[in-house]
Amino acid sequence: EQGGSQAGGSL
């Protein structure tokens, strides 16, 4: 996943 939830940028 690209920019999903893990290393995406939500936090």
UniProtKB/Swiss-Prot annotation:
Q: Keyword Hydrolase, does the record have it?
A: yes
Protein's name in the database = Endochitinase
Keywords, ordered alphabetically = Allergen, Carbohydrate metabolism, Chitin degradation, Chitin-binding, Glycosidase, Hydrolase, Plant defense, Polysaccharide degradation
Its function, per the record, reads: Hydrolyzes chitin and may play a role in defense against fungal pathogens containing chitin.
What enzyme category does the UniProt record give?
hydrolase
Molecular function terms in GO for this entry?
A: chitin binding; endochitinase activity
Q: Does the keyword DNA-binding apply?
A: no
**BP terms from Gene Ontology:** chitin catabolic process; defense response; polysaccharide catabolic process
Catalysed conversion reaction: Random endo-hydrolysis of N-acetyl-beta-D-glucosaminide (1->4)-beta-linkages in chitin and chitodextrins
The source's domain of life comes to Eukaryota
The UniProt similarity line reads:
Belongs to the glycosyl hydrolase 19 family. Chitinase class I subfamily.
- Documented EC number(s): 3.2.1.14
Task: Write down the species.
Answer: Triplochiton scleroxylon (African obeche tree)
